[in-house]
Amino acid sequence: IGYTGKVTTERLEELKQVNDDYELNDVVGRTGIESSMELELKGQKGSQTAYVDNVGRILTITDEVQPVAGNDIWLTLDLNLQKAIYNILERQLAGVLLKTIVNKEADEIVYTDSSNIKLPIKDAYFQLINNNVLSLEQFASDEASDVERQINAKYLNARARIENDIRSELLSGNATLMRDLSEEMQAYMIYIYTYLSSDEAGVIIKDSIDTKSAEYQAWKNNAISLRDYLYYGIASNWIDTTKLNITSKYSNADDVFSALVDYVFQNLADDTEFTKKIYRYLINNNVVSGKELCLALYSQNVLAYDEAEVNRLRASGDDYAFEFLMNKIRNIEITPAQLALDPCTASCVVTNVRTGEVMALVTYPSYDNNRISDPEYFAQLNADQSLPLRNNATQTLKAPGSTFKPITAIAGLEEGAIRIDETINCTGEYEEANPPIKCWKYPGFHGPLNVIGGIENSCNYFFSELAHRLSLDADGNYNPDK
């Protein structure tokens, strides 16, 4: 449906080209139906001419024009169908997560194929923090619960150690090559480099880096330390020293690097993403447990307080924490959108095949349209990794799939690639393509099908052969441009 808000300067210019009544303080549709149907929904403004006294009080009204409401818009959507489909999509996604999340470490999971991907439970625990289901600020607040204080204390101890290790590594005259660092330390070093290269920081001038240099190639291959690579950057003038706090008019490479290290730690102090990266490894290394995070869900009122469950969590180990979180996903008390694990989005469009009317246009996840003008809520939506502001039903690019088969059939008949009474023999696997295209009935097959049978059975083999014929030139040779 969208929402309304004060017109922007750019939108005002567009609207005034159609209707000169629009003014800078007008409230207009900002998104959705409210925006696309703005000209229909807009009414006529009222006016009042009056005499007032010296303090602005109305004495006499001499003329008054009543405002006129705009046109009504009637949607073809079925509200109950919308709600039902949204709930179905959410439960389907939850079902996929229940099959995907396993109580194993990442290195214990054996990848077989894309249809059987498994996720370690620690990914789900981390997403409680990474997708802001749990508030890091609440962990450190005066009102924090015992378990929140416990989590925060572990984080503070780890952060002090990590910052000391990073500083020691950066300032060491014999710095470790990237490939010889631990996975965790390597992740922190890469994060620092990525941060310095970001548009926000702009300390590393990416366009000035010589990508053919030996140092750059060594960096790409983890064969150089971050310290040595940044020293190379200082010498090569792709470190923007104006962003650093260098007081001396003349400074050598050591002065610049020292200022660069100070800059890194000053800015990482309030960097939420770096904080989350530390939590990622605290969870991976079993320093912060799943049990603690599940208890924090009650402390922060993400879950309605349940004394029996809280006591059971406290008395149990991480195996029960896994079972607990799976139950919350199963009951949609923790939603796929909150975890923002793949998959966490879905959509569904239902049309009336007789009239073309759209009966349901559902995107998951969604948001509360009544709160969209709340800046805090809007910021929360923008930070949500499940992208609730994206309308998956209208903005996601999808292959048309079998719905395009009738168009292919019509093209085949019009171009003479097939006659209405001609058949194509479906053997189950179309081998003219590489790799072969399997019919949905494979290892079964449809046998001979004419155009009507091809459409009726939605036969992949039939339409693969028909599409192939449409791509042949006059001599029967394949032409990829046809």
Residue ranges: model-predicted function:
Residues 377-395:
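Surface-exposed acidic, glycine/proline-enriched linker/cap segments
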Residues 1-377, 420, 479-482:
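Periplasmic/cell-envelope proteins involved in peptidoglycan metabolism and beta-lactam response
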Residues 6-10, 416-418, 470-474:
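Short helix-capping/linker segments at secondary-structure and domain boundaries
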Residues 20-26, 67-78, 334-339, 391-398, ...:
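Second-shell loop/turn segments in exported
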Residues 31, 35, 39, 43, ...:
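Residues on a specific face of well-ordered alpha-helices
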Residues 110, 362-364, 372-374, 398-452, ...:
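Short, glycine/proline-biased beta-turn/loop segments that scaffold the active-site neighborhood
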Residues 344, 388, 445:
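Exposed loop/turn and edge beta-strand positions of beta-sandwich/beta-sheet ligand-binding modules
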Residues 90, 410-417, 465-469:
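Short glycine/serine- and small hydrophobic-enriched flexible loop segments
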